[in-house]
Design a protein with these regions (language model features):
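Nucleotidyltransferase catalytic core that binds NTPs
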Residues: 1-122
């Protein structure tokens, strides 16, 4: 069984998020989605997150793409999760191109194309 993992805040879940989750799911047999905790978002300077972590988890669950959802709560958790779950592929949006290459030591890293015309800055009014 090929396991894929991806991470995100998934605030105000939109078509771009859904497309990314679908593409990540298509890479393997089992998709693990890491949703950032409220405190981890604040630590990283994401102060305008509208939905709390439970609302964001529920939105991801409702897409039907996630086989398992975990909460990302600390720096370094990606490596821990990859090893703990026996992940084969780490997938993330291409806007992070190169940023997660250090994970290639642990699994394959795939940068998925963004959905053109979708911007959270256009959604936050």
């Amino acid at each position: 069984m090929k396991k894929v993992i991806t991470y995100g805040t998934y605030d105000l879940l939109h078509q771009g998020h859904i497309n990314l989750l679908r593409r990540a799911k298509e890479l393997g047999d089992y998709l693990i989605v890491g949703v950032t905790s409220d405190s981890f978002d604040r630590e990283r300077g994401k102060l305008n997150v509208r939905n709390n972590v439970l609302e964001r988890i529920e939105a991801v669950r409702q897409t039907g793409y996630a086989d398992e959802i975990v909460i990302e709560d600390y720096v370094g958790q990606k490596i821990d999760d990859i090893q703990r779950f026996g992940v084969d592929i780490f997938a993330i949006g291409s806007d992070w191109q190169g940023h997660f290459d250090y994970l290639k030591e642990f699994c394959q890293v795939v940068y998925l194309p963004r959905t053109e015309g979708i911007s959270l800055s256009l959604i936050h009014i």
